[in-house]
Amino acid sequence: MKIRILATTDVHGYISPYSYSDRKLCKQGLCRLSAHISRLRDEHTLLIDNGDSLQGSSLNYYHNLYEKDLIQPMAKALNYLNYDYWNLGNHDFNYGPDMIHQYINDVNATLLTGNAYEHGQPMGCEYAIHHFDDNYAIALIGVVTQHIPVWEKAEHIQNNTFEDAFDYVKRTVEKIKATENVQGICVVYHGGHELHLETNEPSELLTGENLASKMCNEIEGIDVLIAGHQHRSYAVFVNGVATVQPYENAKNLGVIEWDLDTNERTVELLMADQEVDEELLNLIGPEEQRAQQWLDKPLGRLKEGNLLVHDPIDARIHKHPLISFINQVQLYFADKAQLSSQALFNESVGFNSEITMRDLVSTYVYSNTLKALRMNGKVLKEYLEKTAEYFDAEDGKVVLNRVFYDPKPMHFNYEMVDGLDYTIKSSNPIGSRIVEMVYQGKPVEETDEFVMVMSSYRANGGGEFDMVKNCEVVQDIQKDMVDALAEYILAHPVLEVEHQDNIKVIA
């Protein structure tokens, strides 16, 4: 028997084909994948989503802010497309347990996630056996990266625990092989490959966040692995395991063709280049329209110019005024802090001279709050040294460290700090690149004390900023950053940006 598995991952609420920053049509969104799904689907086809549905798009943000008692648009979309199975992703925990519970209840598909527990009970099934007929069946195992506690707000996961994904899959595969009569095993993993697909060399710090390579290389019995989380796009074989990771925002559909008699498998990715499914678009149309009207709501204006990001690399080498402005807002709310730290996210567009909600949600794309941490000069230098890893030197010029864009872009892990002056020498060895660090005209000493405000993600150690995880929390500002930006702009309708050219990056 020949079966087919269709897979999406990291859809992040992108149902419609429009860019929320400028309303332009794009090759993305479930409504562009719908035609592929309809064409390929038959009685021997499974449709699976691999998590990160509830956070991301402006439609999701609007829904979670104003209409959370209604059915989530992504639940409507998954039900319309008749998904068979789905998995939880790390970002699905961003809005707390009530939102997840409602989503689980609203989605008709079977939840696979077995290694995420709530009150000691698995949130999904241990594993699923899908029978195609009396003689053919496959097992499906769903797991999510266990690193969620590193990033997530404690109150959102206070009743949750997360088992090591590799250990869970290994144990479950062994159980299935010993007790079930199936023709194959498919792992649905909201995590990615930690080794280069071609060289098998580490492509990132081996923290356990991503374990797909380890699963493929060390667990005997996996036939298919659907990966996610990394926002990468590939369809390959790893140690004989057919593995696919479709690109985020429903830009790809993963397709696995599988002969259960011979175990021959093929993998490919299809682009979101089909005609828009108008019926699906109409299904979410009223809420989409309300979200668009909200996005165009004017908030204030800049006194001079704009804060648009035209060259994101240069905006990091020479700190963009947009970063100065966001740090200005953070210091406004964290009134006990002298320093503020902020990253320019991967696809931040910046602000027009007339600022709307569309500018805010297209620029600050994550659901972060703020924390102000007390630290000494030693920890501050360690923090800056970590950010300085973003750069390298080549032929006497400042370039980017390859690990921040290959195999996946991670520009969001370069932080820029306002409130002091410092110099990064990118040709120096990692850990010795901060060659000057001055606060109010004096060199910073290891014993000096500071309070620095940063995102909740970073304060929890996200991006391997482990040096701040144990710092005293002076202020915990439970206000979403988009809300904080909007509140500040409404209170200062004609904005003056206090830009400081305080960071030098040299080769």
Name the predicted role of every residue range.
Residues 30, 71, 97, 277, ...:
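Alpha-helix initiation and N-capping motif
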Residues 5-11, 145-146, 293-307, 357-358, ...:
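Short, compositionally biased low-complexity segments
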Residues 49, 140-142, 188, 226-227, ...:
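Short beta-strand segments
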Residues 260-354, 363, 460, 490-507:
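A short C-terminal boundary segment appended to hydrolase-like catalytic domains
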Residues 1-275, 279, 317-323, 328-329, ...:
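Acidic, metal/ion-coordinating pockets
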Residues 2, 14, 28, 32, ...:
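Feature captures C-terminal
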Residues 17-22, 154-156, 307-316, 365-369, ...:
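Glycine- and acidic
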